[in-house]
Amino acid sequence: MRKNIRYYAVLSVVTALVSLSGCGGTDNGAESGTQSPAAEETSDGAGDAAGSEASGTEADEADTSEKTEIEAIVYELPTEPQKENVYVEPIENLREDFIRGVDISSILAEEESGVVYYNENGEEQDIFEILAQNGVNYIRVRVWNDPYDENGNSYGGGGNDTAKAAEIGRRAAKYGMKLCVDYHYSDFWADPAKQMCPKAWEGMEIEAKSEALRQFTEESLTQIIDAGANVGMVQIGNEINNGIAGETDWTKRRQLLQAGSAAVREVSANTGQDIQIAVHFTDVSDQKGILAIAEKVKEK
């Protein structure tokens, strides 16, 4: 059965419509409501002029709203594989242990919404199997501490908690792929611009926060491995150039990194899995900046 995908685009945004919805800086609705009575109290000529102006404004707004209706453009899905001029040059003589990884953290949310994947023959197939058959040997998955609001609603982005990471890790292992677990130590995305402390850790002193981070890492990682994942690497933080878990002071940041690393080593020893520890910084082309960060990490 042929499926259609609908793409919607807003053609324009009109200030009048925004104001009518209560988002404007002034009460335009009140002004519009007082124009007509004021016009009736004036002389006929002035009233007609004011009434005409008000009517003209209403007409303009009505016309404008018609022009900004959202139109749907329908694209039909192809019924057979399509040839594309996409070619990636192979890299010769790679070692067997060279990491060829893909981050598919949002895959469960995609599948729940009806997304399916097809192989090069146009056949529907498990995306994990497709990746493994095409040389991928590592799957990366992000983990947020508590990516839900007080009503249990996900913040979005795949809602990547430990349970979802465990399921992704299990499916990756089914096809012989290792898992890289990317701990953000936040309830949502952490990056150079924001390293928000998880809700449960707010107000903690660094000693308590370090212990909370160690315990969370140990329990989460154990749960992922118990689900059947073959964990080969763990990231202690995500893009932590400017902070981690709400901390920007380097002494405190090192303490958190040490706590996370200790937890990984403990789980590695308890499960028998050989797990590498990674720290994740951005702007690696800035050699001077990265070397400065490395010195900070090494300080006692």
Model-derived features with residue positions:
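Bacterial N-terminal signal peptides that target proteins for export
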Residues: M1-A9
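Hydrophobic helical h-region of N-terminal Sec-dependent signal peptides
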Residues: V10-V14
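Residue-level signal for mature regions of secreted extracellular proteins and peptides
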Residues: A16-L17, D48
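Alpha-helix termination/capping residues and helix-transition junctions
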Residues: L17, E96, Q133, D226-G228, ...
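C-terminal motif of bacterial Sec signal peptides marking the signal peptidase cleavage site
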Residues: S19-G22
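N-terminal, intrinsically disordered, polar/charged segments of Gram-positive cell-envelope systems
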Residues: D27-T79
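N-terminal substrate-binding region of glycoside hydrolase catalytic domains
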Residues: E69-E167, R171-A173, K178, H184-A212
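Active-site cleft segment of glycoside hydrolase catalytic domains centered on the general acid/base Glu
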Residues: S154-Y155, G159-A166, A190-K300
